[in-house]
Amino acid sequence: MHLRRPLRSRFFVGLAAASAVGALTLSSPATAVIGDGVTDDTYTFAAHLSIGEGDAKRACTGSLVDAQWILTASSCFAAAGQPAYPIPAGAPALKTTATIGRTHLTGTGGQVVEVTELVPRSDRDLVMAKLARPVTDIAPVLLADSAPVDGESLRALGYGRTATAWVPDRLHAGAFAVTATGATTVAVTRDGGTICKGDAGGPALREQDGKVLLAAVHSASWQAGCFGSDATRGDAVETRTDDVIEWVTQVRGLPQGSQAASGDFNGDGREDIAAFYDNGTSTTGKNRVSLFAFYGTASGFGEPEKVWSTPGGFTWSKSQLTSGDYTGDGKDDIAVLYDTGSSETGNITSLYTFASTGAGFRAPQKTWTTTGGFTWSKSKVTSGDYNGDGKDDVAVLYNTGTSDTGNVSSLYTFTSNGTTFDNPRKTWTTTGGFTWSKSKVTSGDYNGDGKDDVAVLYNTGTSDTGNVSSLYTFTSNGTTFDNPRKTWTTTGGFTWSKSKVTSGDYNGDGKDDVAVLYNRGTSETGVRQAALFTFTSNGTDFAAPKEVWTSTGSFTWEASQPVSGDFDKDGKDDIGVLYRAGTTPDGRRIDTVFTFSSTGTGVKAPVKHWMGPII
């Protein structure tokens, strides 16, 4: 892949390798092996990037600069025949996998994570690549805050070719001397090393006073001494990173993941939508989150308001969002089930409540915690007024393990006393045969008795006619839950993994129903499709699902988070969707809110009420 610079020589090229490659060529051409193999468990922030598949496969190197971000060269992702920069923001055009913290690629250490999003610079060969999930057990590298100077020695890392290997399997390192520093680039010459194909995006490190700092990333090289190259010049060009710290910090702090909930947060009788965003990490490495409210109006939803944020210390990936009127004051609040870590007595989980003030939310209050023995990762949370006292409670479907008769699940209820939550009570359990990982949980008053119940959309397996899903209802008796009843099932053709579930009274008869936003896949023309099904309650069971809407244009199920509420204040609940609509060139996520207004027997076509970047 050629770097888009004025032509200097046919050897001066970009460094993304056109095949899976591994090591950096860093030594004299006279030696048998160019470059030093890196000792295991050092430079664990280094990442090997595998981009594309088959004949289009290429490889690059990068650096973990945040638990969920890799800094590398944008030329790695540029399409054939296109400039190295700028490249389009958003999802990579080719499937990209990052291997972080694995010195030997044939080993098993480190983490292997898919890259899901690119945030490029427009002025240089540089891009931030977002990982599908945070890598929390590997320390990111810090960025140098001053430019490399003439004569300075930098240590370069990479997984690219060596003098003798086209496809090495380990990280290599070697020295380079700085010869000049420009506005966005650094010129270097070999001082015991050579940069080869597959090293693009790899780090050039400043090592001094016991610190390792990222000073630049590899962009282009003459490739002297590299396998398959007859070049003799040892020059290379690096992309500066010392002057983009503010940009890297901004990207790290951009809203990433989101969780949605609905409720009447300002008490005006019209339900609203809340979005809980992952704001990455601060410059000091602290995790940040924010809470936005989309308040409903007579004409729809306006621009979201940031109603709470933290400069650090609250981790989105350890949070499960739910909502309800926990104080009984007529305004819905937000609750977060939080992974607090572990103690000598086991895993610790806590409940935080963001109490509504009507105009916003108070700072979160820890309204319940355990000293150990309650595992967040085994919990699925929902809310409802299960005892009918006018205050919503929290329920957790819990993975209790296994028994001789199969997988064991339990329901725990955290009853609100208006200020905090009582310790959880096990209000239902099974001796075996109910699998937590096959369950999606929701709440509603399905029999109309004034007490909310719990429903589970369950993956029942397969039949000759396709995938089988079922609905189970756990009816509240005010104190505990009755054993679950199968209130609907299909003989095949309804896929659990393609379903997102929510509850509401869509026909206004006083009994809550269930809705499923369903993934219809991709059409023959490449258009993403979705559908909406409603399961109407008759007070005892649910009617067979009715397909009340199917997308006619592009509607991406993976980008959708459905919630329910009476958004138009007509006495019938509607469906709302918080939808990720794209990414701005500077990496900010673009969200929109859709509502599917209930007609009593179906829903109207979705209406887009607001769309814009989340800051």
Located regions from the model:
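Secretory targeting and sorting signals
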Residues: 1-32
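C-terminal subregion of chymotrypsin/trypsin-like serine protease catalytic domains
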Residues: 2, 64-78, 90, 203-256
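Conserved catalytic-core segment of clan PA serine endopeptidases
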Residues: 33-42, 53-54, 85-136
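Catalytic histidine site
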Residues: 43-90
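Conserved hydrophobic/aromatic beta-strand scaffold that supports enzyme active sites
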Residues: 46, 69-71, 126-130, 173-175, ...
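Active-site-proximal beta-strand/loop segments in catalytic clefts of secreted hydrolases
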Residues: 49-52, 65-67, 73-76, 100-103, ...
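Chymotrypsin/trypsin-fold serine protease catalytic domain
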Residues: 104-118, 122-194, 208, 223, ...
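Trp/Gly-enriched beta-strand/coil motifs that build multi-repeat beta-propeller-like domains
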Residues: 256-615
